[in-house]
Amino acid sequence: MFVQLRKMTVKEGFADKVIERFSAEGIIEKQEGLIDVTVLEKNVRRGDEEVVVMIRWESEDHWKQWEKSDAHIAGHKANKGKPKPDYLISTEVSMYHVRAVKQGTYNQ
């Protein structure tokens, strides 16, 4: 399994905009090898907010196929030259190979 984590820090009050964008139906769901997309919101009382999007793939090759796909590239070209939203403070993307998974008793 291969995982991409996209951590976005946004100004206070704007996490919902990011959550809405990454929770909406899109073309990625049709991509072969996609396991799931999970959207997480950091529990903060006040101040800047953090949203993490975890995208799980069957393999790194499946992720690479997505990155090179016409649909993915077209999406980036459509946004080329557009300024980033003013509420977006930073974005960090990290890639991981899953080395172990332990199952709990949930849904058993």
Swiss-Prot record:
GO terms for biological process: heme catabolic process. It holds the Pfam family ABM. Induction: Repressed by fur in the presence of iron. Heme binds at residue 76. GO terms for molecular function: heme oxygenase (decyclizing) activity; metal ion binding. Changing residue 6 to A: Retains the ability to degrade haem, albeit at a reduced rate relative to the wild-type. Keywords: Cytoplasm, Heme, Iron, Metal-binding, Monooxygenase, Oxidoreductase. Residues 2-95 form the ABM domain. Gene3D superfamilies: 3.30.70.100. The keyword Metal-binding applies. It catalyses: heme b + 3 reduced [NADPH--hemoprotein reductase] + 3 O2 = biliverdin IXalpha + CO + Fe(2+) + 3 oxidized [NADPH--hemoprotein reductase] + 3 H2O + H(+). One of its GO terms (cellular component) is cytoplasm. It is found in: Cytoplasm. Disruption phenotype: Neither hmoA single mutant nor the hmoA hmoB double mutant display robust and reproducible phenotypes relative to the wild-type. Its EC number is 1.14.14.18. The record marks 66 as: Transition state stabilizer. Allows bacterial pathogens to use the host heme as an iron source. Catalyzes the oxidative degradation of the heme macrocyclic porphyrin ring in the presence of a suitable electron donor such as ascorbate or NADPH--cytochrome P450 reductase, with subsequent release of free iron. Homodimer. Belongs to the antibiotic biosynthesis monooxygenase family. This is Heme-degrading monooxygenase HmoA. It comes from Bacillus subtilis (strain 168). The gene is hmoA.
